[in-house]
Amino acid sequence: MTRKQRRLVFIGTCGAVLAVALGLVLWAMSGTIVFFRSPSEIAREAVAPGVRFRLGGLVEAGSVVRGPDSQVTFAVTDNAARLPVRYRGLLPDLFREGQGVVAEGAMEPGGVFRADTVLAKHDETYMPREVADALKKSGRWQEGAGHPAPAPPRTASGEARAP
């Protein structure tokens, strides 16, 4: 075998090994990938019970009901559709009605989303990109909503000064 042929065999072997390694990594990760869906998408597409996904939207006002043993039920909405959620555990401190939330879990046979993880927005301007995109797509996004007004300028002593 000539030097050129050995080099081509070596490069081909390395390429094949890398392709197999990449395939194994992707196959191993396929079980951990969780897709994001909005309540409107769930209403349009029938999701089989037991399929894990992330549900994102806003906590519907007046829907939070706290039960015994840290059980909480609430509804997630994107202002076009709503989906009831059941969760057992401690909710994040920033969880409240009208705020953005992402819950991870699976649908139950009765059409209720059983969440095992609930994430709440962490400040006044944050909303998960997927939630914002879903709200924009449904035409319910209000530009500038949720952004706090800028604080008035302050003097060195901490007093508010006129702008």
Swiss-Prot record:
Localization annotation: Cell inner membrane
One Pfam family it belongs to: CcmE
Periplasmic side stretches: 29-163
A GO CC annotation given for this chain: plasma membrane
Side of membrane Cytoplasmic, spans: 1-7
InterPro entries: CcmE (IPR004329), CcmE-like_sf (IPR036127), NA-bd_OB-fold (IPR012340)
GO molecular function: heme binding; metal ion binding
Record's protein name: Cytochrome c-type biogenesis protein CcmE
Naturally occurring in which organism (per UniProt): Methylobacterium sp. (strain 4-46)
